[in-house]
Curated annotation (Swiss-Prot):
Organism encoding this protein: Drosophila virilis
Keyword annotations from UniProtKB, A to Z: Cytoplasm, Developmental protein, Hydrolase, Protein phosphatase, SH2 domain
A UniProt-annotated Pfam family: Y_phosphatase
Region (Disordered): 246-273, 599-666
Main location: cytoplasm
Listed name of the protein: Tyrosine-protein phosphatase corkscrew
Molecular functions per Gene Ontology: non-membrane spanning protein tyrosine phosphatase activity; phosphotyrosine residue binding
Amino acid sequence: WFHGNLSGKEAEKLILERGKNGSFLVRESQSKPGDFVLSVRTDDKVTHVMIRWQDKKYDVGGGESFATLSELIEHYKRHPMVETCGTVVHLRQPFNATRITAAGINARVEQLVKGGFWEEFESLQQDSRDTFSRHEGYKDENRLKNRYHDHTRVKLQDVERSAPGAEYINANYIRLPTDGDLYNMSSSSESLNSTVAACPACTAAQTQRNCPNCHLLNKTCVKCAVKSATLPTNCATCNRKSDSLSKHKRSESMSASANASAAGTGPGTPTAAGNTSAAAALNGCLAVLLKKHCGDASPPPSTTSSCSGPLTGSLLNGEGNQFKTYIATQGCLANTKTDFWNMIWQENTRVIVMTTKEIERGKTKCERYWPDEGQCKQFGHAKVHCIKENSTNDYTLREFLFSWRDKPERRIYHYHFQVWPDHGVPADPGCVLNFLQDVNTKQSSLAQAGEKPGPICVHCSAGIGRTGTFIVIDMILDQIVRNGLDTEIDIQRTIQMVRSQRSGMVQTEAQYKFVYYAVQHYIQTLIARKRAEEQSLQVGREYTNIKYTGEIGNDSQRSPLPPAISNLSLVSCKSAVAEPLTAAAAAAAVAANAGNKHAAKLQPPLPPLGASNNNNSSGNSGSYCNSSSSTSTAQHNGVVSSSNNCSSGSGSANSSNANGNGNILGNGSNMRKSNFYSDSLAALKLQQQQLHDAATAAAAAALASAAAPAATTTAASASAAAAAAAAAKYKNIPKDMNSLRQPHAAYVAAAPALPPPPTPPRKT
């Protein structure tokens, strides 16, 4: 129910459009930073109640005070407030927010597992109405090729212009939202169509959601069912309005692009200049979306500027320079192989991602558009030579030498993911995360080598389900890598933005769940890996078996933690949510996090979620752990009581099948390109050292007690000093080794001295 930085108008709009009587949310106060506002829908209007923060307590301007916001909300759920006019303010159901901090992914997944996935996905489906034109796809010559949006489609340049539909291909540019886009997003329950005024018929359909009979029956009543049956399913009036709006925005962006090109400010591109309109159209689309997110506010300059060349990840102007661009396309048909390779050459794509098998369940999902290893094949003007092919448990990597119209060859890397099941989604998100890391590593290495690779081309069969799932996961992970675990992520809104560029992306509820599980798995891995590095520093040795493979067959390459994660302190994470910052501490935090706009945002001191933030994904084990040792398997029962989603426990050396009971990291050994291990020898040495220290302390205490009465004070001082030294000595022991820690020296004094360890047999 906590929506962070949300304005009062946005809160009213959300609750009135999507909520029902009794729906409530809590947001940060816009007028008084540090305070919060409780917004409740009562009798089809919204009541705002100020929540004050003073003397380290929360109150609503009188009455009882509470240590946390959660306690205040629970209290007023049981004891409703009464307005001065006599209206009772009932807090019946929270209006859930989908925008969360990355570190809070476990709590969000746990909440959705209880029944919220279906509701959230259905809300996404209802918000995905057509707001952009598809006129090109409806033409007779293109009807069998594509049904997707016009403003982001890829246009082929090197074709016969006389043939109708020759420049048309089933492919769309997908751009990662800039940081400005994400920062200006309002709560994800807001409809994407808020700027398009609906006709009376659609307005009537919208009001049916607030029918009290439907709410009472928990289903559509007969009256609403009859009324909805008479309404148009695809309103022409709304479509005309949205088409004219999108045309207006596209014309603005294209004129801006033309001005930039005339001024000579655009970057040079390796592809045809005809794609300028496509890039400008997509920027115009994102400007429309951003305006919808921000209300009437103008979008940041980085999102309104158009690029003067084709839309590639390394060629976008402004803030977009940091981010990748993808091409989502359909799997090749028998008559589209030449068009596919034409697009690959035109866009200077060097990495192709294929997420489907050629045949699944007896049906052809994608025609083979490449030759066998060592063979060369011609596809129209395209000549493709497969020079190498390597396979892993999850995917096959092929290397092609590709030329178009006998021009100089380019090296293409074809990543063919082959373990996606015919039904549903993979049981282990780790295999997908490993795959994405290898793909991104290759794309980055090409950019560092100065080859200026174009967009990554991703396709499955239809180019929307698995393709959208892979792209959305990669977008979210890139955001976390850039901004750290304190960044705000919104999976639902990210999918909405991707669907605005190619409709239907992330097609099923199972795929929607999988996006959450994959992001959760990745965040758990970052925390576990960071914690492993901290433990290695505390114990004073390096984890030599944690390896990070950058590509196939190269285990010597290590990838460091992202800077946003390596600077993270797990200890500070625990205290950051425990109590609010003072003014001095807040100023220090702002200074320490300069350049990170998310770090300075105020958050309510919510109570620790404790062991309730368990990982609810099922059986995440497998290829996400690349083991380099096969000596032991650890079973750990780590319990976490803090809200920073950190684990306490060791991992497994020979596989990722460690049992984590009550462990917030789920399968605690799972981590990206690495896994933990149980150092039994080191643990035994540490235990023996602790036993020896305890025996020494006990002997010293016994000698002190046997001394003269005059030395009682001295003995007490020595005992206290020994206790303090012991406490300091064990202060930095990791939680998963607390079981090896001995009791306080004061309690050991009365215990009998432990016998020395047996002498090992002499070797002969």
